Design a protein with these regions (language model features):
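Conserved beta-alpha junction segments in alpha/beta enzyme cores
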Residues: 57-100, 104, 237, 351-404, ...
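N-terminal amphipathic, basic-rich helices that act as targeting or association modules
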Residues: 39, 154-159, 163-311, 627-628, ...
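C-terminal catalytic domains of large/alpha subunits in multi-subunit enzymes
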Residues: 106-137, 164-190, 273, 403-410, ...
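Glycine-rich loop/linker segments at domain edges
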Residues: 2-8, 12, 125-146, 198-242, ...
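Short beta-strand elements
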Residues: 74-78, 237, 374-379, 472-481, ...
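N-terminal secretory signal peptides
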Residues: 1-29
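Thiamine diphosphate
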Residues: 98-103, 398, 417, 421-447, ...
Length: 748
């Protein structure tokens, strides 16, 4: 996903570019007609975001200064029954945002939590990130950036309900209170939110509201079962892949075996003969390549049709990337001068009493979400509707409009629940969305008017590109007998994720992509010279859960542990000394993990060892103390104790789940077979049989502990991943005496 960003870091021209697809076409119903329509579908407060500004203006104009993102009418529906539906402006793909954001709004609304439901937003202008001004689910920003927004939305809706009750009873609004979805008035009078919602919607939206004192929170901070838990655990939850429209067809694409290859011959006679196949279409695919789409009545005939195709490809004009050759090239690059991010004096390196040299290799990694990529497109005259689990509906809407020859406002995106993403559903090229649009356009040109769902198989997904980049690190470190680092000369070689994309303007500085170096040096006060090279092999790359920290945290935390071992220091005490007094959150997280794990006090079984790592990413700090062993040459992780500092916690259960999920994904990086490799341009892996992800038998016991804080929330979707692998590696190194300098682990 996107690395951590601060408000204002996205330049205005990028905001304008991404915002072009926001559907802000007003549906100008008269207010009376709108009220009638809202009532007819059982909704009262906030049914249609396009109408929020127009309705507020017709009610007196008091909210004219408010942005669409500040209008409760776009985010809150209250049915006559009192059921509250909160529209979530982020993609839910397992991180729990469809519970966390409604909790925030419901807190200030003073709603009855048992009556709260949630739904996704769209590419409407109301649902952009309130700080960045674009549609965005990434960078662990969801709760962090929308915390104040959703509090104010809830407070505004509550104020409108109070005003409606005051008008009905003809009393001073100051005499009223709310509790769990009910307005309480003088003399024991009560009105439910459902009874007041229609009247409240007709009132001006207050610009200024008073928010609760955090000591009065009754929902925020409470361990809460996720809204979607029952639907998911019972198999009732619909995802993008489950989209079913009347007359819908399914398309499966034969992609080039080498990225960017083009077709020379197509024999589709056998495919067309398969029952259920409706069309075979040549379509453009990512990186200038060509593919063949088989459109059929369902997935199985489409898949059979694709398997029956006889295709020949021209791979001569495109580079055929090869993992072994790339590693050799990376090693050559590492020895050359390059761009500098840090440039400390390296003179002390020559005279340092102790020295350490190391090389680290990190492979390409596939995102491999449980739900493969899919997108359903329905075209009509001058309009398009898309159903897709999109991390950036604005970006995807712009790309879809361009592919279809439409204006951005003619494209409507229905954001669907997604079964994981980890950054894959946020490609700057919108590759699979553009592909689905190209197929729908070609099918319509061939006389087919049915909606078409384009569906990737697991093999398509793993071989389809957009990987975590392969990286090579080299370090030369000089330190003294007390472990004080005197000079640290470091080189990183790896592809840039953002160069040449719309994100490059604010991510690439002095030729260095910040996503490749985030997590280096900080928070440790190290005299470092950091040199960076960005080669450009023909392999599409993308952010992968926790982005650069997937490799930088491993390098930093294992090398520091190695220095501690070399100077016979406890790794916890060594880190605490490096933190000094400047990093209280790091100290608190690490100390909490140490205290809860029994580190240094509890006797471990024979053949077991402790491992420690701590890392900050996306403004949150996670420290791990792990217990590991080696059995028959195979590393085993037994227990993980986490200390987490993410400031104020909205839902402790979500934080715990995110830490566990991220840690398991970090564990996957360590396991044999968890690498994407290429041979003569072809990806060698295809499914979970040859691309390893952690199974339940690999998963350790978890104890997750959170440092109490009242400061505004920080991100938690990704920070649990980076420190897991180095903590595991440090434990194994203490057992074997040998550092592990590549992922996945290789002990021999």
């Amino acid at each position: 996903m996107l690395p951590s960003l601060e408000h204002g870091e996205i330049p205005r021209n990028l905001q304008r570019l991404l915002a072009r697809s926001q559907s802000d076409e007003p549906a100008m119903l008269p207010r009376r007609s709108f009220l009638k329509l809202a009532g007819s579908v059982g909704l009262a407060l906030g049914a249609f975001p396009h109408l929020a500004m127009a309705q507020a203006a017709s009610a007196g104009g008091a909210a004219s200064a408010l942005k669409p993102t500040q209008q409760p009418l776009a985010f809150v529906q209250i049915a006559p029954s009192g059921e509250v539906t909160v529209t979530v402006n982020r993609l839910e793909f397992g991180q729990g945002v469809q519970t966390a954001l409604p909790m925030i709004l419901a807190e200030e609304l003073d709603a009855d939590w048992s009556q709260v439901r949630s739904r996704h937003g769209s590419n409407d202008a109301a649902y952009v990130d309130p700080l960045f001004g674009i549609h965005l689910t990434g960078g662990s920003h969801s709760v962090k950036n929308s915390f104040t927004q959703y509090r104010e939305l809830g407070a505004r809706a509550r104020a409108m309900l109070l005003s409606a009750a005051a008008a009905r009873w003809n009393v001073d609004v100051a005499t009223l209170r709310t509790r769990a979805g009910v307005v309480l008035g003088p003399g024991g009078r009560t009105l439910s939110y459902g009874e007041l919602a229609e009247a409240a919607m007709a009132l001006p939206v207050p610009e200024k509201v008073t928010l609760k004192d955090p000591k009065d929170f009754r929902i925020i901070g409470t361990p809460t079962t996720r809204i979607d838990a029952h639907a998911k655990s019972s198999g009732r939850q619909d995802f993008g892949i489950d989209t079913r429209l009347p007359g819908q067809l399914t398309a499966v694409v034969a992609h080039p075996p080498v990225f960017g290859a083009r077709l020379t011959t197509v024999d589709d006679s056998a495919a067309r003969a398969i029952k259920g196949v409706k069309a075979v279409l040549r379509v453009p695919v990512d990186r200038g390549g060509e593919g063949v789409a088989v459109v059929a009545e369902g997935y199985w005939p489409a898949r059979q049709g694709r398997d029956a195709l006889k295709l020949q490809w021209n791979t001569t004009p495109v580079e055929k990337a090869d993992s072994e050759r790339l590693l050799a090239q990376y090693r050559e690059l590492a020895a050359r001068p390059g761009r500098r991010q840090f440039d400390a004096d390296m003179a002390p390196l020559a005279t340092a009493p102790r020295k350490l040299e190391a090389e680290f290799v990190f492979p390409y990694l596939a995102h491999a979400p449980m739900e493969p990529l899919n997108c359903t497109v329905q075209l009509s005259d001058g309009r398009a509707e898309l159903w897709v689990g999109s991390q950036c509906p604005g970006l995807d809407g712009t790309a879809a409009a361009r592919a279809l020859g439409l204006k951005p406002e003619q494209v409507k995106i229905h954001v669907q629940m997604a079964g994981g993403g980890f950054g894959r559903r946020f490609a700057s090229t919108s590759d699979y969305v553009v592909e689905a649009c190209a197929i729908a356009k070609a099918a319509r040109a061939a006389g087919m008017k049915a909606p078409i769902r384009t569906l990737w198989s697991r093999e398509d997904d793993i071989r389809g590109g957009y990987y975590r980049p392969m990286h090579l690190h080299r370090a030369r470190i000089g330190f003294d007998q007390q472990g004080k680092v005197l000079a640290w000369d470091h080189v990183i070689v790896g592809q840039s994720i953002t160069s040449g994309t719309v994100f490059g303007e604010f991510q690439v500085k002095n030729g260095i992509d910040a996503t490749a170096t985030e997590g280096m040096r900080d928070p440790y006060p190290l005299p470092m010279r950091l040199t960076v090279h960005h080669p450009t092999p023909n392999v599409p790359v993308l952010w992968w859960r926790s982005v650069g920290s997937t490799h930088t945290a491993y390098v930093m935390e294992t090398l520091l542990d190695e220095i501690a071992r070399a100077t016979r220091q406890d790794p916890v005490a060594y880190r605490m000394r490096l933190f000094g007094d400047k990093h209280p959150r790091h100290r608190a997280a690490l100390q909490l993990a140490v205290d809860k794990s029994g580190y240094g006090k509890k006797k471990l079984p024979a053949g077991h060892a402790w491992g420690v790592a701590v890392h900050e990413s996306f403004d949150s700090v996670v420290a791990y103390v792990v217990e590991a062993s080696v059995k028959e040459g195979r590393p085993q992780l037994h227990r993980v104790t986490a200390g987490v500092h993410c400031n104020l916690v909205v839902n402790p259960r979500t934080v715990e789940a995110q830490v566990q999920g991220a840690a398991v994904m970090g564990l996957s990086m360590c396991l044999a077979g968890s690498a994407i490799t290429l041979k003569d341009g072809v990806v060698e892996q295809s499914n979970f049989g040859d691309f390893t992800v952690a199974r339940i038998t690999d998963t350790p016991a978890f104890d997750v502990h959170i440092v109490p804080s009242a400061d505004p929330p920080t991100g938690m979707g990704e920070p649990g991943l980076p420190p897991l692998a180095p903590a595991f590696a440090n434990a194994i190194a203490r057992l074997t005496g040998k550092p592990l300098r590549q992922l996945p682990f290789k002990l021999t």
